[in-house]
Design a protein with these regions (language model features):
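Soluble non-cytosolic domains of exported or imported proteins
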Residues: 3-10, 23-34, 89-97, 124-128
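Acidic/histidine-rich catalytic neighborhood of metal-dependent amide-processing enzymes
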Residues: 83-191
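Proline/glycine-enriched tight loop/beta-turn segments at coil->beta junctions
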Residues: 66-73
Length: 191
């Protein structure tokens, strides 16, 4: 099972890892957006959320997974743009590959809560895609149970002191880059 998952994650990375900055690598940006649209569209109700920046239209890709629950929504997102000159292998192809496999898993196995997966655009320019989408949620008064942002999931360095923190935090967290952190307004937890 894990070999198959590993193979699928690798296949996604082969398609996503490329320069895909929306301003300097528009062909790569378009290619990855269409790949995500195709992959996400297999698993539930797919739609686009359009927003504008500097007079141009950009697109967040949204998948609502099948679920009849009236419970508050769980939102899971990852961004698909990159900084200029970067293929974005870890920032954020790894998050997108996991997002696509979550689509597969929850498309085949209904969750107890409704789940919405979103591939955000223009995150590298000030979180513009997620801000535009959060404004839409606020306008529609959408209840959320939680939001998970899948960001840079593929890096691991077990060498001591490979992870740095501000001085006041260094005693609370590991000094190796081999963990996943979850944060909210209320707490930070390490896995």
């Amino acid at each position: 099972m894990f070999d198959l998952l590993s193979d699928r994650l690798s296949q996604h990375l082969e398609q996503i890892v490329r320069e895909r900055n929306p301003f300097f690598s528009s062909q790569g940006h378009f290619y990855v957006r269409e790949y995500l649209r195709q992959e996400l569209g297999q698993w539930g109700k797919f739609e686009s959320h359009f927003f504008t920046f500097q007079g141009k239209v950009y697109e967040n890709l949204i998948l609502d997974l099948p679920n009849n629950s009236q419970k508050p929504l769980i939102l899971i997102g990852a961004h698909y743009d990159t900084v200029p000159g970067s293929q974005g292998a870890d920032d954020n192809a790894t998050g997108l590959a996991v997002l696509l496999e979550l689509a597969r898993f929850f498309g085949e196995n209904q969750a107890n809560y409704p789940i919405r997966l979103i591939a955000f655009d223009l995150e590298e320019y000030g979180l513009l895609g997620s801000i535009a989408y959060s404004e839409k949620l606020k306008q529609t008064k959408q209840d959320l149970r939680l939001m998970l942002s899948l960001e840079m999931l593929g890096y691991c360095d077990k060498n001591p002191h490979s992870q740095k923190y501000p001085a006041f935090l260094e005693h609370f967290y590991p000094n190796t880059e081999d963990f996943i952190a979850g944060s909210s307004r209320f707490c930070v937890s390490m896995v």
